[in-house]
């Protein structure tokens, strides 16, 4: 069987091609990967299933790739200068979503080239552009490809021109394939072999090993499986290895390749991609972007570009029934084994009881984590409104980091800084007006705009992250009939005039409803929450005021009218003073009740107030 040559490692680097596929959600990346797996015969026809590389249910259901995957494939080109030679291709499948940009950048670092995959019926999207620029910064060879040319709505000529303008190539150089039918895929693989450079062999055979971690997953039986790309030197089983960011040393229990199921091998040489297992049980020990080297006589310098993942968005997660709290803690621990960028700390809320304050990379990450908790661990959760990380300086010059409204310092504050992001939006040209209005309403500052083609425009804004995390994306979609695409990346911080709005029930603040908003939006938030709660909280025997306050100043108020019994029903005719006496008596009773009565907010009211359109 000629195809088995890819299973031998220590391949000569000149016969290796490492590449990844950059594409937007739904542009057919996983389908194309399926075709490539079939063509190279690494998956038997009987084992084939759609979206072969997306293993999590949630990945298949939403049609997105969350964890990077990698596969080692044999390929014998049928055309071009390498015709008939045995080439080993290593395909790294990257997440396409903006929240996972750092993971994408590490996966790109592990490749020498990238296939830019664009749907021939939709054209390029903002997040694809962001990843494309990332690939160009890493000096990768880009192969532009239009997918889904079998669709009746496809317009390959129009979009080939658009891609050619962005990448800087000729429109006829843009390859056309169909991942579904397999048309053009063999030619694409031949082009990969021809155009993508081979990895560099490193300084010498016996140079100290340096390998970059681009992903790690937790396996119940074997502990953490770390995916690496060897840059120079060799790694073999039973060696002692060292992680350069933490200095921790481990013994290499097993090393191997993924083709597409894990297979043990004798070791990995320069340019090769594979996995290693050290028996460690905690994913945080093998960090994405870290450098692996020998523990003895290892490399001095780590590879460039390692960063600690920093949470951008915070939200409180509380179990609907308090009995589930230990289960939620166990579930978060298990998720963290697989997702090192998730952070959490215990939090108590007067209104919602015990829960956790969790930090996420972005909105999609938050949604997916919540989905997985509910689906895989069968938990019912309430999540509080998302917030970001603020830097607050008080009158005494003390600096505080605040990502929870209940930690907001009281008293006068000297300066408040909020995180800002660079936003790129691609919209059809007829929606430019409404999109710009929306961005300005969300305190955006325009950075510039470019026409990608005559009917598609790229808008660039600097915006506060706090304005985006509520419902910006939904509003953008509704104003552009669903055609807009959005990408954002961190851009530091700016000073802002922010205040904390408290919601008071009968004069008592309810911590779950507090929010940090811009002073101009405080009135709007206060009105919105008081009106919403008025309709959600059941009427009591006495009148209940719902107020919104900034500090000690009340900015909005709604009253829940009291339920009252008709005390005059038994009086037929009769004297007015008799009626007045009964009414006065009722009034005094209500007043006494109001002093001692407390308002129970039903659980459903919390869920409805926190989960429906948050802005």
UniProtKB/Swiss-Prot annotation:
Keywords: Cell membrane, GTP-binding, Hydrolase, Membrane, Nucleotide-binding, Protein biosynthesis. This is Elongation factor 4. It holds the Pfam family GTP_EFTU_D2. The gene is lepA. Gene3D superfamilies: 3.30.70.240, Elongation factor 4, C-terminal domain, Elongation Factor G (Translational Gtpase), domain 3, P-loop containing nucleotide triphosphate hydrolases, Translation factors. GTP binds at residues 26-31, 147-150. One of its GO terms (biological process) is positive regulation of translation. GO terms for molecular function: GTP binding; GTPase activity; ribosome binding; translation elongation factor activity. Required for accurate and efficient protein synthesis under certain stress conditions. May act as a fidelity factor of the translation reaction, by catalyzing a one-codon backward translocation of tRNAs on improperly translocated ribosomes. Back-translocation proceeds from a post-translocation (POST) complex to a pre-translocation (PRE) complex, thus giving elongation factor G a second chance to translocate the tRNAs correctly. Binds to ribosomes in a GTP-dependent manner. Belongs to the TRAFAC class translation factor GTPase superfamily. Classic translation factor GTPase family. LepA subfamily. HAMAP family: LepA. InterPro entries: EF-4, EFG_III/V, EFG_V-like, EFTu-like_2, G_TR_CS, LepA_C_sf, LepA_CTD, LepA_IV. It is a peripheral membrane protein.
